[in-house]
Amino acid sequence: MSLVAIGINHKTATVDLREKVAFSPDKIHDAMKSLASRTRSGEAVIVSTCNRTELYCNNGDEADIIAWLEEYHGLDHKDVAPCLYNYHGQDAVRHLMRVASGLDSLILGEPQILGQVKQAFVKAKEAGTVALTIDRLFQNTFSVAKKVRTDTEIGAAAVSVAFAAVSMAKHIFSSISTTKVLLIGAGETIELVAKHLKDNGVASMVVANRTLERAQGMCEEFGATAITLAQIPDYLPKADIVISSTASPLPILGKGMVEKALKQRRHQPMLLVDIAVPRDIEPEVADLDDAFLYTVDDLHSIIEQNMASRKEAAEQAEVITEEQSFLFMDWIRSLESVDSIREYRSQSMAVKDELVERALNKLAQGSDTEQVLIELANRLTNKLIHAPTQALTAASRQGDLNTLGQLRSALGLDKH
């Protein structure tokens, strides 16, 4: 039984090559069936994301799996081979556990990869390319990833600007879900901020953007209200939290506008997070008594501290994945021993059945009973001791005392 993991990721290949070896959702079902047909066990799972494509197979030949990948995508070996990595046995198990735990991700400890691995496993089950070994491998992997997140602090600290902005708001407001939020801009960063806010239960969001259509498209997904930049003065007094990220060369919020809004709020505090470069909010806003202004530099210092914390947690996570990969291989070896015992018993029974049938035929033909029984016993003894005798002889000739000792112990010779 041999587990194989072959892949390509953001560390080994350019985005251009990663796109070429990726599997689209509408094709991955048939792709897994095709890949599984190239293994002796019929087991295969394909994990394909924007940052990685990995093939996990049981009883597959490495060279054949690589050839399949190249054939499937119509790529030259010389273009793909230098960017591939491969793992076997316990190393393959450990690699999958590291991937699912976020230890091999572009952003250390990011949780999205676990959901992507789970989705790949579900698709493989639907395709019929999962049996005992791969099923146990992935189920164990999901348990390990959960253990990593509960037993370490790898996912506790923010390491993206968007996540850090929302984390800061959570520390300042005791119940962020009841706050009113004004988001300025409708780009990727603000969209990610909106996602984190929604995940934290924020229901009241307003998105202000230069282009109303762009803001409306984003608001549909998050249940927010879209406004233009010109409407900001009307909505600013209602905002407990303001997070801004536009490409404007000039500030969007000036000290005067914020001061006026604070007066209308009767000086209830307002958190303003400016993650734009150049800045969207005039730095003088920080001088206002009830305004708490943070910039992208403040967030980066938090992120650096948090990344150091994640790296420390990652060291603990590495120990967990190492230990759990050993335990999984113990289970694999137990399966192999069961298979060996079953095969040995089956072989011995076949020898017995053959010789008993021959003896019964001789008795039916009138042969002497005692002679037939003696012949049966001798033939059965010779058949059963043939393989052990050969193994003992070979170990003795080679001077392999370790193997010789193990054979003597297995055959019960040391008991006499």
From Swiss-Prot:
Residues that, per the record, bind substrate: T49, C50, N51, R52, S105, E110, P111, Q112, Q116
This protein's UniProt keywords: NADP, Oxidoreductase, Porphyrin biosynthesis
Q: Name one GO molecular function term.
A: NADP binding
- Hey, which pathway is this one from? Porphyrin-containing compound metabolism; protoporphyrin-IX biosynthesis; 5-aminolevulinate from L-glutamyl-tRNA(Glu): step 1/2
What are the residue positions of the site described as Important for activity?
H95
A Pfam family of the record is GlutR_N
Lineage, top-rank taxon, reads Bacteria
* Active site annotation, chain numbering: C50
Q: Name one GO biological process term.
A: protoporphyrinogen IX biosynthetic process from glutamate
Q: In its keyword annotation, does this UniProt entry include Methyltransferase?
A: no
Matching entries from InterPro entries are given as: 4pyrrol_synth_GluRdtase, 4pyrrol_synth_GluRdtase_dimer, 4pyrrol_synth_GluRdtase_N, GluRdtase_CS, GluRdtase_dimer_dom_sf, GluRdtase_N_sf, NAD(P)-bd_dom_sf, Shikm_DH/Glu-tRNA_Rdtase
Please tell me which top-level EC class this enzyme sits in: oxidoreductase
Q: What family does the entry list?
A: Belongs to the glutamyl-tRNA reductase family.
Task: Spell out the HAMAP family in the cross-references.
Answer: Glu_tRNA_reductase (MF_00087)
State the domain notes: Possesses an unusual extended V-shaped dimeric structure with each monomer consisting of three distinct domains arranged along a curved 'spinal' alpha-helix. The N-terminal catalytic domain specifically recognizes the glutamate moiety of the substrate. The second domain is the NADPH-binding domain, and the third C-terminal domain is responsible for dimerization.
Q: How does it assemble?
A: Homodimer.
Under what name is this protein listed? Glutamyl-tRNA reductase
